[in-house]
């Protein structure tokens, strides 16, 4: 999939595991825009925008799969199937300097804050760096360095907070044969040593 040539992107990654996040979209004044929300598996679960919800100002609370609670008046709930959420917004732009400025002004009016900070000034906390991760190494190379057990152990932890879709049940049944079950720790005893060694070769053969 190629990036759009006639839109400017507005994107964010956030975790709704601890609490919902609230997205405030300004009045787009009829301008075409869409704001797909993707779960941890990049499945789109909601798409507010001109075609679906119009261009007036609107506010949404993106909640996690296990969240239950009350939202402020005027805030609509969008429930994410996973804790990890990717907002991948696109706003139409003609490409002229004047329209770039107009879209940038709209982008500056967007707000994305934790529910506990909604309606109040919010300053994101300083980020932290995991020093155990080589930030100069590509993701592909980092994954390729992992053993099969390391990879499936990490995947099982991620699947606890980011459950696979129900439509993936047939594949999940196959994964269980090697000890990978959604919601549980990885059972390395079910992964045969000879198969673990062959996994990189099998993966490469399937891709090629």
Q: Could you say what each language-model-derived stretch is?
A:
Residues 1-208:
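A compositional/structural signature for long, glycine/proline-rich flexible linkers
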